[in-house]
Amino acid sequence: MEGRNPLNNGRSSDDKPNSDGVKPRTPTSSYRKLRRELSKTKLRIPHIWLRHRGLEPSDVFLASYPRSGVSWTRFILYEILTGEEAGFAAVNAGIRGVGRHTLGLRALPKNGRLIASHEQYRKEYKRAIYLVRDGRDVALSEFAYTSALEFFHGDLDQFLRTFLCGKISGFAPWHRHVSSWLDSPIAETERLMVVHYEDLRQNPVQGFTSIAEFLGLDVDPKRIQRAVTNNSLEKMKKKEVAEPQKASMKDRFVRNGFVQGWRSKLTEQQLEFIEQHAGSVLARLGYPVFSQQQAAVHSRPALQRTSSLS
């Protein structure tokens, strides 16, 4: 149709969310919904400041953009640190998020804590592991997650516009978040370790061995192998199902953990739109960039042209 927005996907105007792709509905969790919305307001600034009190030089941060595989990573690291079986309660109590870190597990050298954070780089972060995942897979995972929890009610095209503007959550657009870490004062030093989620998935034992070395841990290789085996995505899903507070499927946090799912889930128009915003950061991280591969399109798997997450 002439003049049609290529990122519209034909959604009727009668069922159209607002400009941010968000339609008011009864949320799955009123508290979670309120907390998410407040994170996108100016109240976030003093709240972040308060959350970063009580940090110590021996603390190490496990930082990531949401939906980058940090839950799986935390489970394995918890078993590496403690030698104990990782369950949701134990992991959440041991490797706590920033703001809840006071009572976190002190299992690092010099009595340090491993603290999780979804924030952009901050000067308080003196030493960190930055877990990064292909932004296209992050977007697909976040779309599935926020749609299931009724935080977002638009289609995938509307979601991508909102996601790339940083309006899905209070953590800034994916590409800006990544750049804040890659361009930080601790980048290119021994105080920052950038880890690709895809590398961890391909060779988890080697990847977590390197992380343990970065943390200054002397760990038996058998413990690392056991931690990886005990926390496959399939086993984590079973652990989550056993959690009493996970009453319904849409409350599930552990999903597929796919790698390069974007190749079959995103259309060429959607890929081009993403790369207009984040292409340079994707390339900087070493991820394949669609616009740079037009001439070599026959040398890689063909993109399946689909407009929805099926």
Provide a role label for each language-model segment.
Residues G69-G83, V194-V219, A227, K235, ...:
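PAPS/PAP-binding and catalytic site of the sulfotransferase fold
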Residues T229-K250:
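Short acidic/His-enriched helical or mixed secondary-structure segments at domain edges of catalytic enzymes
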Residues Q225-S232, L271:
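C-terminal anion-handling pockets and recognition modules
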Residues F88-V91, D220-R226:
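A short coil-to-beta-strand element that immediately follows conserved catalytic motifs
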Residues K222-A227, S291-A295:
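Short, glycine/acidic-rich hinge or "gate" loops at secondary-structure transitions
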Residues E2-V195, A247-S248, F253-S310:
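PAPS-dependent sulfotransferase catalytic domain
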